[in-house]
Amino acid sequence: MFQSKDLNVYFICGTQDIPEGRTIQEVLKEALEGGITLYQFREKGNGAKTGQDKVALAKELQALCKSYNVPFIVNDDVALAEEIDADGIHVGQDDEAVDDFNNRFEGKIIGLSIGNLEELNASDLTYVDYIGVGPIFATPSKDDASEPVGPKMIETLRKEVGDLPIVAIGGISLDNVQEVAKTSADGVSVISAIARSPHVTETVHKFLQYFK
């Protein structure tokens, strides 16, 4: 059963985010040991795996998450999420509409990216379990990221969505997480600050301290 606290420290990662000399399996295991509360498999960009290689990797990482009782979410790829029976799916504004697949994801976690009021007003949140708001800060992890909206956008959208869980995303690091923790966000989505940390487990511990 999905709860807002599952968003506390939400790790998003694919092979494209892993520094040289490391593997995604190593990094994810260390992040799980550190206490991440949710993991999203986002395999896209230069050098990302495709086809059966992507499926095989997803299954391997899914099993790792299961051993730590951490939900495994697939970014964007509805077919993959169905094929491996993932715990949920996260889609953006330009991806497949939630209305098109929600009936195939009953009992699963559905997340939607929302960057501003216009996107919120254009979105049907009937079947959405949480929204990802951002980019809060400038982000190096997404080539297609739009302009940063700042922590204030969380409060702007909170007034509109009530108790719907909100996770902040985009450029979040240990240097700026305190600004997000002061808002009504239920947690933070983090890519590079965890994936590229020389001390992954310790970094996750530090993020968790802001969302107890």
UniProtKB/Swiss-Prot annotation:
Condenses 4-methyl-5-(beta-hydroxyethyl)thiazole monophosphate (THZ-P) and 2-methyl-4-amino-5-hydroxymethyl pyrimidine pyrophosphate (HMP-PP) to form thiamine monophosphate (TMP). Mg(2+) binds at residues 76, 95. It catalyses: 2-[(2R,5Z)-2-carboxy-4-methylthiazol-5(2H)-ylidene]ethyl phosphate + 4-amino-2-methyl-5-(diphosphooxymethyl)pyrimidine + 2 H(+) = thiamine phosphate + CO2 + diphosphate; 2-(2-carboxy-4-methylthiazol-5-yl)ethyl phosphate + 4-amino-2-methyl-5-(diphosphooxymethyl)pyrimidine + 2 H(+) = thiamine phosphate + CO2 + diphosphate; 4-methyl-5-(2-phosphooxyethyl)-thiazole + 4-amino-2-methyl-5-(diphosphooxymethyl)pyrimidine + H(+) = thiamine phosphate + diphosphate. One of its GO terms (biological process) is thiamine diphosphate biosynthetic process. InterPro entries: Aldolase_TIM, ThiamineP_synth_sf, ThiamineP_synth_TenI, TMP_synthase. CDD domains: TMP_TenI (cd00564). 2-[(2R,5Z)-2-carboxy-4-methylthiazol-5(2H)-ylidene]ethyl phosphate binds at residues 139-141, 171, 191-192. Signal peptide: none annotated. The gene is thiE. Its cofactor is Mg(2+). Binds 1 Mg(2+) ion per subunit. 4-amino-2-methyl-5-(diphosphooxymethyl)pyrimidine binds at residues 40-44, 75, 113, 142. Keywords: Magnesium, Metal-binding, Thiamine biosynthesis, Transferase. This is Thiamine-phosphate synthase. It holds the Pfam family TMP-TENI. Its EC number is 2.5.1.3. GO terms for cellular component: cytoplasm.
